[in-house]
């Protein structure tokens, strides 16, 4: 399993940032690996809302269907994405920080079946993709104000069953 966790501080209030990031169809605006993103159901975003994302990863386009499994405005939102080869869990939290809101992006990506043998290589590539997405998110949320970014050490854990 590949794991990525990083935080940025932004000037917008948590309610505004939560509303933007909980609509995963906006991912294309800030994650350069995402080439398509759309909401599949519902007018309002909430638990159970589904999204279709197509991302380029390791030279291939991969389509995943994501579903919101946790929706706690303006504190946290968790997406669970899946296709035939991978499972992705993306959790975004929003916390007060001095004169800002701290946005923490915590993601796990696990290969399914026999593909799990490639998990160590996946972890390295996933961290590069995560760093580019975080840089895009920082630009999108605070275009005029560069913010501090912190990322925990890259790690890979045991593959999901």
PLM feature spans:
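Structural motif
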Residues: 11, 71-73, 97
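Glycine-rich portal/gate segments that line the openings of hydrophobic small-molecule binding cavities
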Residues: 38-86, 102, 132-151, 159-161
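Amphipathic alpha-helical segments that line or abut small-molecule/effector binding pockets
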Residues: 15-18, 131, 135
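Well-ordered beta-strand positions in beta-sheet-rich domains
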Residues: 5-7, 63-65, 89-91, 106
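Hydrophobic ligand-binding cavity/cleft-lining segments
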Residues: 1-40, 46, 158-161
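Beta-strand/loop substructures that line and gate deep hydrophobic ligand-binding cavities in soluble
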Residues: 80-132, 149
């Amino acid at each position: 399993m590949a794991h990525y966790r990083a935080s940025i501080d932004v000037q917008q209030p948590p309610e505004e940032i939560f509303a933007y990031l909980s609509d995963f169809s906006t991912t294309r605006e800030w994650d350069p690996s995402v080439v398509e993103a759309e909401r599949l159901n519902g007018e309002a975003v909430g638990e159970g809302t589904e999204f279709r994302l197509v991302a380029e990863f390791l030279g291939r386009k991969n389509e995943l269907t994501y579903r919101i499994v946790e929706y706690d405005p303006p504190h946290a939102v968790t997406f669970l994405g899946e296709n035939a080869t991978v499972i992705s869990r993306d959790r975004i939290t929003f916390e007060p920080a001095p004169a800002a809101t701290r946005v923490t992006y915590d993601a796990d990506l696990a290969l399914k079946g026999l593909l799990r043998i490639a998990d160590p290589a996946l972890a390295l590539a996933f961290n590069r993709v995560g760093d580019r997405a975080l840089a895009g998110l920082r630009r999108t949320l605070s275009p005029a104000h560069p913010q501090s970014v912190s990322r925990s050490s890259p790690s890979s854990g045991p593959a999901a069953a």
